[in-house]
Amino acid sequence: MLKEEDKIFTNLHGGQIHDLKSSKKRGDWDNTKALLDKGRDFIIEEIKKSGLRGRGGAGFSTGMKWSFMPKNSEKPCYLVVNADESEPGTCKDRDILRFEPHKLIEGCLLASFAIGANNCYIYIRGEFYNEASNIQRALDEAYKDRLIGKNACGSGFDCNIYLHRGAGAYICGEETALLESLEGKKGMPRLKPPFPAGFGLYGCPTTINNVESIAVVPTILRRRASWFASIGKPNNTGTKIFCISGHVNKPCNVEEAMGISLKELIEKYAGGVRGGWDNLKAIIPGGSSVPLLPKSLCEVDMDFDSLRTVGSGLGTGGIIVMDKSTDIIYAIARLSKFYMHESCGQCTPCREGTGWMWRVMIRLVKGNAKKSEIDELLNVTKEIEGHTICALGDAAAWPIQGLIRHFRSEIEDRIKSYSVAIS
C-alpha cells in the first residue's frame, strides 16, 4: 500500500484549485532551475536509475528512450506528449490534464531539456475539449511567469510548448500515426525503422512519451531516483494511476504502488465487486487491448511482469470489472467492433481481419456457429497478431484470445443451446 507522503498526484481527484499559485503550494515548480542546472546527463541518469517505465502501455524504460536521442543533432529535436487517451476503460491521463496540468508542463520542460528539444507538442484527444482549454490556461500562466518560453526559469534554455488537438481517431494514439497527424497528414502508422529518435516529427529526432510518464518526472528528480525505485517491485518500480470501472461499487482513479494485488486494489478503493468477490466473473486488467483474466487469476499483482506471467498485461492500468451478470462473449464482441471501427486500413491483416473477427463474434454471441469455428477464430487472431505495422492488430486479437483461453466452454454451451433451440 502506498503511503500518503509518497503520492505524486496530490490533486488527482480535483479537490483543490489547479491554477499556478495553488500548484506551487503543492510543490510544483519548486526551484526547477536547480534541476536544470544539474545538466542533461544528470536528468537522464536519474530517470534511468528510478526504473520508470512508460505508463502508456508498452512499459519501455523512459530514461533509456531519452538516451537514444542524439546529443549534437544538426536538426532540431522535438518532444511530443501523447495525450490522445482513447483506450476503452482508461481515463488516467484525463484527470492529470484536468487537475494536475502544471505537473505535466513542468515535466515537459525537464524532459525537453534532457533530450535537447526546444519545442514540445502536447497532442491531446479531440474529444477532450475542456481538458485542452485547461492545459492552454496552464500554459498561458507558465509563459506569463516565465517558467517556459525564452530563458525558461532563468536557466538559459529556451522551451516552447504547444497544444495540438486531435480529431478523434484512436489510431493516433500510436506514436508514429500521431506524428503523421501532427504534420497535418492522415494518421497512419509508419514502418519502423527508422525510429522516431532518428527520424520523427518533420524528419527530425523526436521522443514521444505518455502524459503520466512525463508528469512524474519533476517529483522523481526532486526526491531522487532512489526514492522512486524503493516503491513497488524490482523492475516494476514507482507509483501508477489505476482506473477502476465496471461492476464495482465505487468506480475511481487511484494512485498506488506498482505490484499491489488486483483484489486489494478493487476492495480497498472501489468498494469491492458489486455483489461481493464471489460474484466476480472476469477482469480486464489493463485497458481493452489486453486479455481478460478469469476470477481464479484475479489476485495477481498489478505490474508488468506479474501480469505477463498469467497471460495478460498491465497496459494502461485500466481495470474493467465484470460480474456474473455479464455476457462475456458479447462484451468481447463489443470490443471487436471498436477495433474494427478504429483500424486505419493500412495493413491487410488488420483491415480485413478485424471485420471478419467481429462478424464471427456476433454469431458466437447468438450461438449461431459451429464448434470448429472457435479454433478457426483463434487461428485468425494469430495470423493478425504480429503481422501489422502497429499494435492495433495485436490489440484486436488479444481480447478474443483471452476469451477463448478462459471461457471456451461458455462459447461451446452457447452454440449447443442455439442448436437445441432451432432443432
Swiss-Prot record:
One example GO MF annotation: 4 iron, 4 sulfur cluster binding
Domain of life of the native organism: Bacteria
Cofactor, free-text remark: Binds 1 FMN.
Keyword Ubl conjugation in annotation: no
E.C. designation(s): 7.1.1.-
Binding-site residues for FMN, renumbered to this chain: 166-213
Cofactors named for this entry: FMN; [4Fe-4S] cluster
UniProt key word RNA-binding: no
Organism: Rickettsia akari (strain Hartford)
Known role: NDH-1 shuttles electrons from NADH, via FMN and iron-sulfur (Fe-S) centers, to quinones in the respiratory chain. Couples the redox reaction to proton translocation (for every two electrons transferred, four hydrogen ions are translocated across the cytoplasmic membrane), and thus conserves the redox energy in a proton gradient.
Similarity-based family: Belongs to the complex I 51 kDa subunit family.
Reactions catalysed: a quinone + NADH + 5 H(+)(in) = a quinol + NAD(+) + 4 H(+)(out)
Residue positions binding [4Fe-4S] cluster: 344, 347, 350, 390
Residues reported in the UniProt entry to bind NAD(+): 54-63
PANTHER family: NADH DEHYDROGENASE [UBIQUINONE] FLAVOPROTEIN 1, MITOCHONDRIAL (PTHR11780:SF10), NADH-UBIQUINONE OXIDOREDUCTASE FLAVOPROTEIN 1 NDUFV1 (PTHR11780)
InterPro entries: ComplexI_51kDa_subunit (IPR050837), NADH-UbQ_OxRdtase_51kDa_CS (IPR001949), NADH-UbQ_OxRdtase_suF (IPR011537), Nuo51_FMN-bd (IPR011538), Nuo51_FMN-bd_sf (IPR037225), Nuop51_4Fe4S-bd (IPR019575), Nuop51_4Fe4S-bd_sf (IPR037207), SLBB_dom (IPR054765)
Keyword annotations: 4Fe-4S, Flavoprotein, FMN, Iron, Iron-sulfur, Metal-binding, NAD, Quinone, Translocase
Gene: nuoF
Listed name of the protein: NADH-quinone oxidoreductase subunit F
